[in-house]
């Protein structure tokens, strides 16, 4: 009677540990691996991914002139702001690029000098392009980008969005990659609404003004923050997982209209007005323009407006934006790569219809936008109102070839002109002398 040969003892092909009740092995075609080696391999692969992400991010940073040239394709005017932003973004990502090269061992380390980051504060009237500038910068550099509305932020524990949610959304925008999120750009809109209210009662907790400024300080300056890993599609697994995000390298850009800020500037730089009488010096009646005042903004003006000194200090780069005039709105409608007129012309082209705006119509749209005081974002609502009826009717009318908008159409005195196929053919024959 022959007995079966003893079973061959299995060992982990990586560490050599023997298979046992407490040491199961995962078998492959030519080997086995234990749980401890699986976890170690996971860490190694994750480190490879981290190095790949950093290698992608530390690629060549566009030079300031290249950044501004790209901004020029999408944002009309605002030359000073675009120059300031181009330099600030270049310096920020140049610093990160060199730091990442040191981490990857691609460059020598200089521990004596640590270059700090310079967050940006954009100041200008509503609709002058603050959000567009920030989003375009993120697209140029190729980093994750989120917009946070300062008016919805509250201190943790109160109804509303707490500051940590900004980082959760940034992680989602980075497709769950913590490394990419830590190189992202956060734009905080309407930050002027966080100014301290002078009429706030002494015993009333300011949960959405100064309180939010205080809550933002540690994020903006740089700290280790734990957030829920909702966005971790690449690396994450189960719900409830938390990840730590280092905000030291996140570029924060804040923006706001700051209505009335120019009065603080004018009071600071203007001549004294206290002298009266026959021998008092004659004051120049010409007051500075708004854009001239915005270009002279100093931290003390922001403090008088209601921002706390600690918050102001975290935004050393100030980029003023000029009010837009009619000529600027005309250019915004027609010149950028994704100009509104071109967007609607493309929509109509899907239906085989040519959309035409006459020059007087373009000027009237610009003038109406100034009358409404809504800034560039008000242009779309005006065009939507003008084209609402044709956009409703044209898909059902296959013979329409052209849609013409003139000044009377903009003013509501006449409907848009629809040129149909038979009219177009008749006009062509008339021009050729056939009719």
Swiss-Prot record:
The protein's assembly and partners: Component of the ClpX-ClpP complex. Forms a hexameric ring that, in the presence of ATP, binds to fourteen ClpP subunits assembled into a disk-like structure with a central cavity, resembling the structure of eukaryotic proteasomes.
Function: ATP-dependent specificity component of the Clp protease. It directs the protease to specific substrates. Can perform chaperone functions in the absence of ClpP.
Residue positions binding Zn(2+): 12, 15, 34, 37
Binding site for ATP: 125-132
A biological-process GO annotation: proteolysis involved in protein catabolic process
Keywords: ATP-binding, Chaperone, Metal-binding, Nucleotide-binding, Zinc
Gene3D superfamilies from the UniProt entry: 1.10.8.60, ClpX chaperone, C4-type zinc finger domain (6.20.220.10), P-loop containing nucleotide triphosphate hydrolases (3.40.50.300)
Pfam families with a match to the protein in the record: AAA_2, ClpB_D2-small, zf-C4_ClpX
UniProt GO MF annotations: ATP binding; ATP hydrolysis activity; ATP-dependent protein folding chaperone; protein dimerization activity; unfolded protein binding; zinc ion binding
Disulfide bonds: none
PROSITE patterns, sorted: CLPX_ZB (PS51902)
InterPro entries recorded: AAA+_ATPase (IPR003593), ATP-dep_Clp_protease_ClpX (IPR050052), ATPase_AAA_core (IPR003959), Clp_ATPase_C (IPR019489), Clp_protease_ATP-bd_su_ClpX (IPR004487), ClpX_bact (IPR046425), P-loop_NTPase (IPR027417), Znf_CppX_C4 (IPR010603)
Protein name: ATP-dependent Clp protease ATP-binding subunit ClpX 3
HAMAP family in the record: ClpX
Domain ClpX-type ZB: 1-53
Family the entry assigns: Belongs to the ClpX chaperone family.
């Amino acid at each position: 009677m022959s007995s079966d040969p003893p079973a061959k003892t299995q060992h982990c092909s990586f560490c050599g540990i023997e298979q046992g009740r407490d040491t199961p092995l995962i078998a492959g075609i030519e080997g086995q691996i234990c749980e401890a080696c699986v976890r170690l391999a996971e860490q190694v692969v994750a480190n490879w991914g981290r190095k790949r992400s950093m290698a992608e991010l530390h690629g060549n940073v566009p030079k300031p002139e290249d950044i501004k040239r790209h901004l020029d394709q999408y944002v009309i005017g605002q030359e000073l702001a675009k120059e300031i932003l181009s330099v600030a973004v270049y310096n920020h990502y140049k610093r990160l690029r060199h730091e990442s090269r040191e981490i990857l061992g691609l460059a020598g380390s200089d521990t004596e000098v640590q270059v700090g980051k310079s967050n940006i504060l954009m100041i200008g009237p509503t609709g002058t392009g603050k959000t567009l500038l920030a989003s375009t910068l993120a697209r140029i550099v190729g980093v994750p980008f989120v917009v946070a509305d300062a008016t919805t932020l509250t201190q943790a524990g109160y109804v509303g969005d707490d500051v940590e949610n900004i980082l959760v959304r940034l992680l989602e925008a980075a497709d769950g990659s913590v490394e990419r999120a830590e190189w992202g750009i956060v734009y905080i809109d309407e930050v002027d609404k966080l100014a301290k209210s002078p009429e706030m009662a002494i015993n009333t907790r300011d949960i959405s003004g100064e309180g939010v400024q205080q809550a933002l300080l540690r994020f903006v300056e740089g700290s280790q923050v734990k957030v829920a890993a909702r966005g971790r599609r690449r690396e994450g697994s189960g719900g409830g997982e938390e990840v730590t995000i280092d905000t030291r390298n996140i570029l924060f850009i804040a923006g706001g209209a700051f209505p009335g800020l120019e009065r603080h500037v004018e009071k600071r730089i203007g001549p004294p007005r206290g002298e009266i009488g026959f021998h008092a010096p004659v004051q120049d009646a010409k007051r500075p323009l708004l854009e001239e005042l915005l270009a002279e903004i100093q931290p003390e003006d922001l403090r008088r407006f209601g921002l706390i000194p600690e918050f102001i200090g975290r935004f050393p780069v100030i980029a003023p934006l000029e009010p837009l005039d009619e000529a600027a709105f005309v250019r915004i409608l027609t010149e950028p790569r994704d100009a509104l007129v071109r967007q609607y012309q493309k929509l109509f082209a899907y239906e085989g219809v040519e959309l035409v705006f006459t020059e007087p119509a373009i000027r009237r749209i610009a003038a109406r936008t100034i009358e409404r005081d809504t800034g560039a974002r008000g242009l779309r609502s005006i065009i939507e109102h003008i084209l609402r009826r044709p956009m409703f009717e044209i898909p059902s009318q296959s013979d329409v070839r052209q849609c013409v908008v003139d000044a009377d159409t903009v003013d509501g005195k006449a409907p848009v002109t629809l040129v149909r196929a038979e009219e177009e053919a008749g006009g062509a024959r008339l021009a050729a002398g056939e009719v």
